[in-house]
């Protein structure tokens, strides 16, 4: 059970890393005063926080 949970967490972590990278890339195409820039930044911050929480959980395994 623990191995499966760890495997799932690693898969989620990998997916989050890829998604965050894509969001950062998309954000670079926007001007800083564009409302979408702020939305992308908020999403990046939320997903980065989640990714860090998963990293902490993985350290416990």
Give the predicted meaning of each segment.
Residues 1-6:
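Short, low-complexity cationic-aromatic patches
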Residues 7, 14-61:
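Short, charge-rich amphipathic interface segments used for partner binding and complex assembly
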């Amino acid at each position: 059970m623990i191995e499966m949970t760890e495997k799932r967490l690693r898969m989620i972590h990998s997916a989050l890393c890829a998604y965050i990278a894509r969001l950062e890339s998309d954000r670079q195409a926007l001007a800083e005063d564009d409302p979408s820039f702020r939305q992308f930044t908020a999403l990046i911050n939320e997903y980065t926080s989640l990714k860090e929480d998963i990293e902490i959980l993985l350290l416990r395994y």
